Design a protein with these regions (language model features):
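Extracellular "spike/adhesin" assembly and maturation modules
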Residues: 1-142
Length: 142
């Protein structure tokens, strides 16, 4: 699976009548976040000790519902990834409950911003590693 640039410009507002206008979270957004976390895990295990993320199954299709436990698992997978690698501070993730509050644009910006930051940092760490060519006397050395 390939890296997809996270959406970090989520926006929204609610008018005085309680009507929301702004970005909507859909199947492609869920898949992007889920798959980017898996991509980061695959990148991280080349630099850090082996660890695993909880699988969220197949990609979602339009019309699929997202449940509180799945959204919580995205947050937990981010926390697992962060804890096993760079240990950055990305704020505290809320816990979602069935028929309770849902992710808003602020939480989506925090989540996808953290994913992008980890990607940038892990990429820099991977590309910045020193590598040596060892010849062991092949060209008239000692």
């Amino acid at each position: 699976m390939a890296w997809q640039t996270p959406k970090t410009d989520w926006h929204g507002s609610t008018n005085s009548e309680g009507v929301y206008t702004g970005d909507r979270f859909n199947a492609s957004d869920f898949n992007r976040i889920k798959n980017n976390l898996t991509f980061l895990r695959d990148m991280a295990i080349n630099l850090y000790k082996e660890f695993s993320l909880v699988s969220l199954g197949d990609d979602r299709v339009p019309g699929d519902y997202f449940y509180a436990d799945e959204i919580n698992q995205l947050e937990e997978n981010l926390e697992t990834l962060n804890t096993n690698t760079l240990r950055m501070s990305y704020g505290s993730a809320p816990v979602y409950n069935d028929n309770g509050t849902t992710m808003d644009f602020k939480e989506l910006n925090r989540l996808e911003g953290a994913i992008l930051d980890l990607y940038d940092r892990l990429t820099n760490e991977s590309e910045g590693r020193r590598t040596f060519t060892w010849n062991f006397g092949m060209k008239g050395g000692l």
